[in-house]
Each structure stands twice: as C-alpha cells, then as structure tokens.
C-alpha cells in the first residue's frame, strides 16, 4: 500500500517536470528570472533590517548577584579574564579613581579614549557593579583601541597571554603617569612688582590658574608595584655586598619538581623563588684588599675571584599582589609543553618569612592584651589606615634558614644540600604582619598552542556595605557568569593569582587601642 502511494507521487512529480520542460526556453527563462528577482529583493530587505535595527535578539538583563560578562571579539578571552580579575581588586580601582581625578580638574569632559586609566576605570567599575548598567554582556574593544594608541599592536583574532597583557597595562599606566608634570607652576610675581605702595603684610601670592599638585613619585605608583632585594655574600670572607633593589609588578614563580606523595603548594614555589644560588667566578673586593695587605712594597694583586651566594627577598610588598605560575616548560627536543600540576593555594597568604629584614631590627613586642582572642577574623586594609611596612617579622618561625636577606654564615658550607622548608601546619593569621586575601584566580584550559582563559573572582560587595568583602565566588568565561564555591576555586589549576593586602586581627586591635589613647 505504501509502495503504491510512493510510486504515484513519483509519477506526478515526473509529469510536472516534463510539462515544465515542454513549455519552451522563453517561458523557462521568465520563470527563473522572476524567482531570482524575488530572492534578491528578499536578501536586500534582510540586509537592510540587520543594518538598521541590528540582529533580532533580545537584550538580556543581568541576574541579581552576578556581574556583567564580556563579549569575545574573536580570541579575546585573555583580555576578558584579566579584566574580570582586576575588577575584583578594590584597591586598584581606588587608585585609578585617584589617579584620573587630575583629568577632571583640568577639563570638564576629558576624552576617555585618549587615556588608558580612564578607559580601564570605566570598564572595571562596570564589571564591579559600581556603575549603573543592566546589560548582561559588555564590550571591551575600547581597551584594545586605547592600547593601540600607546603603540601596542594587539590583535583580537590571535591568541594572546593574559600575563603579558597584564604587564602591557601596568607599563602603559607608568608611561601615562610619567607624562604628567611633577612640579607645581611658578608663582607669578609680575603683578606684585607693579604694586609699589603696599606694606609687607598686604603682599599675597597670586597665580595664573590653579597650580598642579606636587606629585609624589611613590604615592603615584600603582598598587601592584613592589620591590625585590638582591644581595650577595662571599663564601670565602663572608663579606656582604650592598643590597640592590629591583621593581616588579608581578611575581613570576617557577613550579619546582614535585615529590611523590607530597603535594605542591604556593609556599614551595615562593621558597624556590627566594632560595639562594651560588654564583661562581665573582670578583670580591674584600678578598682582594685582604690579599693586598700581605704583599710587600705595594705590589699589585690580581683581583680575587670567589664564589658568592645570591639571595632574593621582598623589600617592598605591594598593596595588590599578582602571582604568575610559570606553566611553560621545554622538552628534551625543544618543544614547548604545559605543566598541568595542581599547585595548592589558600584563601589567605602570609608573606612574613619572604620579607627582607634590616640587620639589627628585632621583632616588636605586641601588647599582651591583644592576645586574648587570636582568631582568623580580618579587616580589609583601606587607605590611610593601612599599616606602614615595617622591618620586623613577628610571625616568622624561630628557626630560619635565611637571616636578614642573606644566608647564615654557619650554613654557608652546606648550601649545596637541599634544606627542608618549615611550613606551618595550621597558620596563625592573627599574628601576620604581611597578610593577603585571595581576590581572583585566572585559569588556562588547553595546551601551549591553543586554549581558553576563565576567571574565578569574588562577587562585588553589597551596596549597603561597600567596604566589605564578599564571600561569594563567581566563575566567568567571556559572557557566561555563574556562581561558584570556594572549594571549586581552590581546586583549580591557577595561572594568575590576585591577592590584596588585609589587616590581621591583631593589627586591627592595635589600631583601635591607639585610637582610644
């Protein structure tokens, strides 16, 4: 029954085709021409509607408790993930607000497309819900446009690295800062010289226009700016060279080889970063002077070359700490490989044992009244109330391998042997002087040739308490945003870690005691 119906349908179709073919070439041409005209008109109408009204899609509104996503412009997940991470750092946004206030004083409507700081501030405030917007997805192409004005050629269709873009942004902000005047206008005394019959009490200073405020070089540094200390100790005479300071915007840590049965931690990476290394064939001026004292008649002595021990420490810790875990490695054949090991990190990070000590400074004695309730309760460091970096380390362990940025002389002969690193089992955050809180994590999925960047970040604080820190975490992948747990964040394979310095409970209580006095 079914086969007979199918045969009948095929026969009817064949008859229609045969009638169309017998109509003649002229009729067939007219029919095909009419269908072509109709198809062209339909395509033109569709194109016109798209140009005038855009794509026919509903603009979604952002769900409550989430942040806006960012549209992927081709391969811009590296930029989107970095912006989401930076927007979770309130200290960086406050610095941008203070830095860009100079433009609002100079002109009523500053062109934001000319300044990286203004463009970045606008994006970060929108991503941190500090600007009123109901859009679920934002466009960050303006950042690429302003970076091109700073002579950075960044394509939105080529895969880039989020860590490299971070340094592009920080270096461009420093260039913008250096273009600003660092001295005030000279006082205009010409009008004072023309007034002859006045008393000294009537003399006042007059200016042409408002003078620029004197710029403090250290105050204008962005919150990610820190300093490393590097010093060298001669293994022969134990002479210590002068300390050298180098700046950094992020700590790029290599991942040491894992030991079977022992997990890798962020503390292991930090210890590997500051661990001492031997530098051979270095001229020691002190050894040369000692050798010259034993010569007769002022004979010239060749420069004495010995082995030095080089030691790194953190001389100035920034307000916002960016840590980069180097996941690039090279095989024996010279091909790049990605390291997928999980590096354990915590929500809070104590940096006391990595801080540089000045010789002769002793740990300060805390008020015994402050030790009654030593708990992990923390207060966010904010503005002028932030503690001034000090040189004592009350939270450092009693047994230390390194002292004052150099190796202890008793350990110099045994530096080649690996030494255990004392890691606290249960860290006491209440006594830490340099304590940091995790704000965002950038994760890279894929290999060294292609992949995708996503971000774990804290949700912005509520409008009722804008100075608080939210405990809600978000997972952001370009324009997709969802809630995440802290356990999911700590289980991720971090590529970039963003920490922000906070006050420990002991420091907060100490400030309260001083204010009461």
Curated annotation (Swiss-Prot):
Matching Gene3D superfamilies: Cysteine proteinases (3.90.70.10)
Catalytic activity, reaction form: Thiol-dependent hydrolysis of ester, thioester, amide, peptide and isopeptide bonds formed by the C-terminal Gly of ubiquitin (a 76-residue protein attached to proteins as an intracellular targeting signal)
Span list, region Disordered: 364-395
Gene name of the encoded protein: USP30
Protein name: Ubiquitin carboxyl-terminal hydrolase 30
Free-text function comment from the UniProt entry: Deubiquitinating enzyme tethered to the mitochondrial outer membrane that acts as a key inhibitor of mitophagy by counteracting the action of parkin (PRKN): hydrolyzes ubiquitin attached by parkin on target proteins, such as RHOT1/MIRO1 and TOMM20, thereby blocking parkin's ability to drive mitophagy. Preferentially cleaves 'Lys-6'- and 'Lys-11'-linked polyubiquitin chains, 2 types of linkage that participate in mitophagic signaling. Does not cleave efficiently polyubiquitin phosphorylated at 'Ser-65'.
Organism of provenance: Homo sapiens (Human)
Enzyme class: hydrolase
SUPFAM superfamilies for this protein: Cysteine proteinases
Mitochondrial intermembrane side, ranges: 1-35
Residue intervals of the USP domain: 68-502
